[in-house]
Amino acid sequence: MGIKGLNAIISEHVPSAVRKSDIKTFFGRKVAIDASMSLYQFLIAVRQQDGGQLTNEAGETTSHLMGMFYRTLRMIDNGIKPCYVFDGKPPVLKSHELSKRTARREETEKKLQEATDQAEKMKQERRLVKVSKEHNDEAKQLLELMGIPYITAPCEAESQCAELAKCGKVYAAASEDMDTLCYRTPYLLRHLTFSEAKKEPIHEIDTELVLKGLDLTLEQFVDLGIMLGCDYCDSIKGVGPVTALKLIKEYGSLEKIIEYIESDSSNSKWKIPNDWPYKDARELFLKPDVINGNEVELKWQPPNEKGLIDFLCGEKKFSEERVKSGIERLKKGLKSGVQGRLDGFFQVVPKTKEQLAKAAAKAKAAKKSGKVTKKRR
């Protein structure tokens, strides 16, 4: 689900923290991709002309494999070295959100049965899409054959992607979930795995510029995310994005915000959930269950050509001609990606406080003038 309204807050208050770029901009970059989110996108977006999912002759769904194969090839074509991170066991605190999703699925199934219009049926069918263990296992098998590294996180994929980026194993985390910023990834890439036909630029969000532009510490930013609404607990009823930002800036923490709300009867319009586990939610963001990034070794290997043809063509009935063409693109792209970037030959020096303060001032000036300034790489 991510965090409701966070993207809008950043766009309004720190527009210069978001850079919109063509995929070619990231030539030579290593990127950790939220695999589960990507597979969900593929199952929804990769469809036949009649709107149904792609299937082979046996009726098995292949949309996830088609999407994974060709979207990965597109990244490789553009010199990006992707690695994928799969979700592990969801935290106990997420069970309430999963229960909500189950209830929504039941409601959607009811609407699907009642739908008479074809467009409405397709709409409800897409809402029922769910990534299964089989989808994940087949995607891992495909990546193994392609020579693309992947890891299974102990818990949330986004937090593991952020960990790899923080440790310098990759340049950025790629996910559509804005809560990835709460794990303090240096950069978050959105829309990286979108279809080329969408013509959607990649949004690169600089976490440090976001924090400085909003004038918040990481802890305060996480508290803001919890107030806006995250996967781990309910939010304060009646508090929207504008009020949430105002409260966290004025009071500095959820503890003091709760104290303020409970101290004045005029604040009764805001409802704090009973037994609100916001501290546990905060802990999941600040101290996530991840594999230490320094202990992870990412290797991109030559593709297993025979294995790919046997799996995709023999078993899944993909076009052999197209798969062989894809294999050649894969081999060529992995070689060209080895060239790397010029800045890869130099040590990356963290931004100083003065540089961050200057960038924050620039962001505020851009907001006042109504102009969005692009940071240069």
From Swiss-Prot:
Mg(2+) 1 binds at residues 34, 87, 156, 158. Phosphorylated. Phosphorylation upon DNA damage induces relocalization to the nuclear plasma. PANTHER family: FLAP ENDONUCLEASE 1, FLAP ENDONUCLEASE FAMILY MEMBER. The keyword Nuclease applies. It is found in: Nucleus, Nucleolus; Nucleus, Nucleoplasm; Mitochondrion. Signal peptide: none annotated. GO terms for cellular component: cytosol; mitochondrion; nucleolus; nucleoplasm. Belongs to the XPG/RAD2 endonuclease family. FEN1 subfamily. The gene is FEN1. DNA binds at residues 47, 71, 156, 229, 231. Its cofactor is Mg(2+). It comes from Vanderwaltozyma polyspora (strain ATCC 22028 / DSM 70294 / BCRC 21397 / CBS 2163 / NBRC 10782 / NRRL Y-8283 / UCD 57-17) (Kluyveromyces polysporus). Interacts with PCNA. Three molecules of FEN1 bind to one PCNA trimer with each molecule binding to one PCNA monomer. PCNA stimulates the nuclease activity without altering cleavage specificity. This is Flap endonuclease 1. Keywords: DNA damage, DNA repair, DNA replication, Endonuclease, Exonuclease, Hydrolase, Magnesium, Metal-binding, Mitochondrion, Nuclease, Nucleus, Phosphoprotein. Residues 1-105 are annotated as: N-domain. The lineage of its organism: Eukaryota, Fungi, Dikarya, Ascomycota, Saccharomycotina. Its EC number is 3.1.-.-. Pfam families: XPG_I, XPG_N. Its main location: nucleus.
